[in-house]
């Protein structure tokens, strides 16, 4: 189909009268429709012109030059016959309006505080301050009246000697450096001394199984805070960490009491609730108690399964009715004693591995322990459990092996205490003047003056440190947080118990 090329619609209207007539008729019909549909008699803003489409159409036989028409290869669509939409009143068309807008000034973006995070390992961003670095840079020692008076007298001597005066901040820095170096070096010496006194002691035994032997994969591990010794398997240590190791109670900073015996300290693990603690040895030797995960040796479970008769037993060694006691394994012998009391007195406590890989625990009272040891020494084998007579709970230990062991343990403890006291009395030997002077870039004479004053002040204060160590402050803060969490846990536990009680009462009604 050919389409004619027309310069403009006005020329078509002048040259072809029929086209203008068609447009006028169409416009009148459009105006008539619009006037009928509108309540107000006004001209429409636009109409559809069909004359433009008619003027463009040419028959294929029409003779034109090739540059006067375009050939459309696309098929013709019927909706194109509706015409072209054109405006009727050009005055009603909105005129474009433009104006120059003033340049907006960019506002400074302020990052919300909740998105600001400071990490100790990463340097702070530009414009922000690392709180930890700022706290470490602040001097923790403050001068008191005595320090100020001594500083004034010392500065007068410095003037006479021709030395520069010493300011308060420098004095605080030097005294803080003395305290920090003394604390670090003394702790290292204490750990070394206590390590030599325990790890290389031939009498040291595991706190759980009381065995002094270790093997590959089941080494004996010492707590760096309370110095208890345990096997890896006995305490559930899957992998020995490099460096220091702390038991569960020391790691949490708590000193709980055992639920089953009156002994304080030792290798303890928590129950399922986490609020009560039990010695691992007590959990192993009391038959009703179990351990949730044998690999980790925690939590302690089934404490509620202990019968009331066992809770009512009185220990024959400490004479206390506290916790749950065990009884002698000899038939017809009912002597009761705590597990930890039996270990402290050196009673015979055996672990037997049965044929079906079942572990049996045998415990013997003081009388039967002495009989069995005497018979084993003479080569007569083990004692006959069925024929052994009943012993009284008040029978004393016949061979004083337990007392001798207690004396040796007390002697070792007293030796350690003497070493520790000697280290505390000689605290000033753990500070090197040259190292402090080089670290702070101060003259050795000034540091020596402060060193002598620091020694006198600590001796007057019974060798106590002048500032609290950072580690102790962190431990105190951690302990406070632990106490808060513990109180919350107790609150939630009581709340749950109350809800369960209400639910039970509701069900009964």
Swiss-Prot record:
Mind telling me which GO cellular component terms the entry cites?
Answer: cell projection; cytoplasm; cytoskeleton; histone acetyltransferase complex; nucleus
Give residues where Phosphothreonine occurs. Answer: 92
- Region Interaction with KAT7/HBO1 and histones, as annotated, extends over 60-80
The chain residues annotated with the modification Phosphoserine are 89
Q: Which sites are covalently linked via Glycyl lysine isopeptide (Lys-Gly) (interchain with G-Cter in SUMO2)?
A: 114
Q: Would the keyword rRNA processing turn up in this protein's UniProt record?
A: no
User: Which keywords belong to this entry?
Assistant: Activator, Apoptosis, Cell projection, Chromosome, Cytoplasm, Cytoskeleton, Isopeptide bond, Metal-binding, Nucleus, Phosphoprotein, Repeat, Transcription, Transcription regulation, Ubl conjugation, Zinc, Zinc-finger
Which residue stretches belong to region Disordered?
1-45, 373-399
SMART domains from the xrefs? Answer: PHD
Zinc finger feature spans (C2HC pre-PHD-type): 255-289
Q: Name one GO molecular function term.
A: zinc ion binding
Q: Is Transcription one of the keywords?
A: yes
Q: Where in the cell is it found?
A: Nucleus; Chromosome; Cytoplasm; Cytoplasm, Cytoskeleton, Cilium basal body
Which residues are the signal sequence here? none
GO BP term (any one): chromatin remodeling
Q: What does this protein do?
A: Scaffold subunit of some HBO1 complexes, which have a histone H4 acetyltransferase activity. Plays a key role in HBO1 complex by directing KAT7/HBO1 specificity towards histone H4 acetylation (H4K5ac, H4K8ac and H4K12ac), regulating DNA replication initiation, regulating DNA replication initiation. May also promote acetylation of nucleosomal histone H4 by KAT5. Promotes apoptosis. May act as a renal tumor suppressor. Negatively regulates canonical Wnt signaling; at least in part, cooperates with NPHP4 in this function.
Indicate the quaternary assembly: Component of the HBO1 complex composed at least of ING4 or ING5, KAT7/HBO1, MEAF6, and one of JADE1, JADE2 and JADE3. Interacts with NPHP4.
Entry-linked PANTHER family? PHD FINGER PROTEINS (PTHR13793), PROTEIN JADE-1 (PTHR13793:SF79)
What does the record say about domains? The 2 PHD-type zinc fingers are required for transcriptional activity.
Family membership: Belongs to the JADE family.
Q: What is this protein called?
A: Protein Jade-1
């Amino acid at each position: 189909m050919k389409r004619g090329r027309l310069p403009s619609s006005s020329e078509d209207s002048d040259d072809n009268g029929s086209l203008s007539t068609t447009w006028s008729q169409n416009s009148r019909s459009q105006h008539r429709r619009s006037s009928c549909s509108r309540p107000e008699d006004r001209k429409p803003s636009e109409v559809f012109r069909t004359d433009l489409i008619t003027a463009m159409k040419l028959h294929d036989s029409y003779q034109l030059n090739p540059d006067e028409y375009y050939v459309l290869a696309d098929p013709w669509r019927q909706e194109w016959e509706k015409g072209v939409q054109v405006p009727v009143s050009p005055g009603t068309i909105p005129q474009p309006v433009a104006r120059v807008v003033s340049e907006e000034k960019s506002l400074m973006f302020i990052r919300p505080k909740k998105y600001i995070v400071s990490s100790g390992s990463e340097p702070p961003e530009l414009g922000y301050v690392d709180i930890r670095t700022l706290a470490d840079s602040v001097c923790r020692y403050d001068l008191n009246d005595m320090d100020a008076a001594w500083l004034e007298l010392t500065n007068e001597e410095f003037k006479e000697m021709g030395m520069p005066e010493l300011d308060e901040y420098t004095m605080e820095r030097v005294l803080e450096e003395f305290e920090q170096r003394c604390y670090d070096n003394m702790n290292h010496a204490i750990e070394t001394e206590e390590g030599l006194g325990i790890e290389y002691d031939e009498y040291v035994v595991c706190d759980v199984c009381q065995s002094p032997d270790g093997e590959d994969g089941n080494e004996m591990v010492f707590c760096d805070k309370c110095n208890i010794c345990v096997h890896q398997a006995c305490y559930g240590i899957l992998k020995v960490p490099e460096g220091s190791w702390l038991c569960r109670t020391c790691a949490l900073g708590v000193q709980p009491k055992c639920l089953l015996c009156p002994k304080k300290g030792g290798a303890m693990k928590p129950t399922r609730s986490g609020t009560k603690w039990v010695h691992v040895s007590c959990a192993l030797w009391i038959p009703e108690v179990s351990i949730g995960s044998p690999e980790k040796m925690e939590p302690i479970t089934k404490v509620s399964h202990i019968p009331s008769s066992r809770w009512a037993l009185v220990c024959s060694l400490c004479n206390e009715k506290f916790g749950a006691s065990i009884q002698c394994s000899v038939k017809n012998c009912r002597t009761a004693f705590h597990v930890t009391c039996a270990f402290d007195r050196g009673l015979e406590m055996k672990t037997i591995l049965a044929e079906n890989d079942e572990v049996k625990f045998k415990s013997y009272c003081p009388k039967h322990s002495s009989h069995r040891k005497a018979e084993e020494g003479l080569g007569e084998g083990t004692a006959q459990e069925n024929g052994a007579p009943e012993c009284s709970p008040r029978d004393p230990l016949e061979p004083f092996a337990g007392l001798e062991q207690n004396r040796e343990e007390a002697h070792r403890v007293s030796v350690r205490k003497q070493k520790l006291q000697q280290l505390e009395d000689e605290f000033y030997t753990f500070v090197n003047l040259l190292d402090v002077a080089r670290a702070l870039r101060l003259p050795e004479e000034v540091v020596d003056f402060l060193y002598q004053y620091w020694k006198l002040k600590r001796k007057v204060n019974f060798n106590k440190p002048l500032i609290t160590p950072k580690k102790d402050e962190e431990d105190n803060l951690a302990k406070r947080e632990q106490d808060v969490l513990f109180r919350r846990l107790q609150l939630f536990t009581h709340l749950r118990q109350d809800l369960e009680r209400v639910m039970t009462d509701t069900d009964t009604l």
